C-alpha cells in the first residue's frame, strides 16, 4: 500500500471567508467523510471552523 492511500494530504479552508487554509493529513479509514475542525484564523484573529476542501 502506498503512503498516500490511507492518509492523503487535505486542505482545511476557513468558513469565515478569509481564504486562509491549513494543510494536514487525515486517516480515510477512521474519517471517511469531510472533517471540520475549530482552529485559529490569523486574518480575523479568532477561532473558527475549518472544513475539508476537495
Curated annotation (Swiss-Prot):
The keyword Ribosomal protein applies. The keyword Zinc-finger does not apply. GO terms for biological process: translation. PROSITE patterns: RIBOSOMAL_L33. It holds the Pfam family Ribosomal_L33. One of its GO terms (molecular function) is structural constituent of ribosome. Gene3D superfamilies: Ribosomal protein L33 (2.20.28.120). Keywords: Ribonucleoprotein, Ribosomal protein. One of its GO terms (cellular component) is cytosolic large ribosomal subunit. Belongs to the bacterial ribosomal protein bL33 family. This is Large ribosomal subunit protein bL33. The gene is rpmG.
